[in-house]
């Protein structure tokens, strides 16, 4: 609304993140198997940082609404990919640390943290935006991502999976009701 676009465009910008997350999930798993979960988590967090940078550029380019909209779209796509890689990698990293015997516990932790972050993130994002604007919110996003990367880097890596890879379709077929 601030940029002069309709609610349709706002919804499209928001939904881009979720489409990107869904479409990049199979790649996140494949790369985690090849490179190891820690590298995938750091890559995903780097994507979160870059999404914040894209939002900052969108804020700075507010005099050009179409350019700002495209930068917001780019940021949402990058965030979706980053979320996919960070989420997939963190689950696999957790399983690598505690062992497959506790896989249910790791998945539960990941779910609690992920949904807790989404539940808190949306209202905190609105609060930040109302007080410090888009450029300030972008700075917060970049700072949080950078702190997360700095927390992840010193942690021990686990070995990449050596099992037979399954296609995304096969995995989906196993979990689909």
Q: Across the structure, where does each feature detected by a protein language model lie?
A:
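Helix-to-loop junctions at the C-terminal end of transmembrane segments
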Residues: 24-36
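Cytoplasmic helix-loop-helix junction between adjacent transmembrane helices
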Residues: 75-114
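Small-residue (Gly/Pro/Ala) motifs that create kinks and tight helix-helix packing interfaces
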Residues: 117-129
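Residue-level signature of mid-helix packing/kink "hotspots" within the transmembrane helices
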Residues: 18-26, 118-119
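C-terminal ends and interior cores of transmembrane alpha-helices
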Residues: 46-65
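Symmetry-related core transmembrane helices of the 12-TM Major Facilitator Superfamily/SLC fold
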Residues: 136-152
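Juxtamembrane intracellular "pre-TM" segments in multi-pass secondary transporters
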Residues: 156-177
């Amino acid at each position: 609304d601030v940029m002069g676009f309709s609610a349709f465009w706002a919804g499209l910008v928001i939904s881009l993140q979720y489409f990107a997350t869904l479409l990049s999930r199979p790649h996140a798993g494949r790369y985690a198997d090849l490179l190891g979960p820690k590298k995938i988590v750091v890559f995903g967090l780097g994507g979160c940082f870059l999404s914040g940078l894209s939002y900052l550029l969108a804020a700075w380019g507010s005099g050009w609404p179409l350019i700002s909209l495209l930068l917001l779209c780019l940021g949402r796509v990058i965030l979706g990919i980053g979320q996919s890689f960070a989420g997939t990698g963190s689950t696999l990293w957790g399983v690598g640390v505690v062992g497959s015997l506790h896989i249910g516990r790791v998945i539960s932790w990941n779910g609690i943290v992920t949904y807790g972050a989404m539940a808190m993130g949306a209202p905190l994002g609105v609060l930040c935006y109302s007080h410090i604007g888009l450029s300030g919110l972008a700075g917060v996003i970049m700072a949080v991502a950078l702190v997360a990367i700095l927390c992840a880097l010193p942690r021990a890596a686990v070995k990449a999976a050596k099992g037979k890879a399954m296609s995304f379709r096969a995995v989906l077929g196993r979990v689909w009701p």
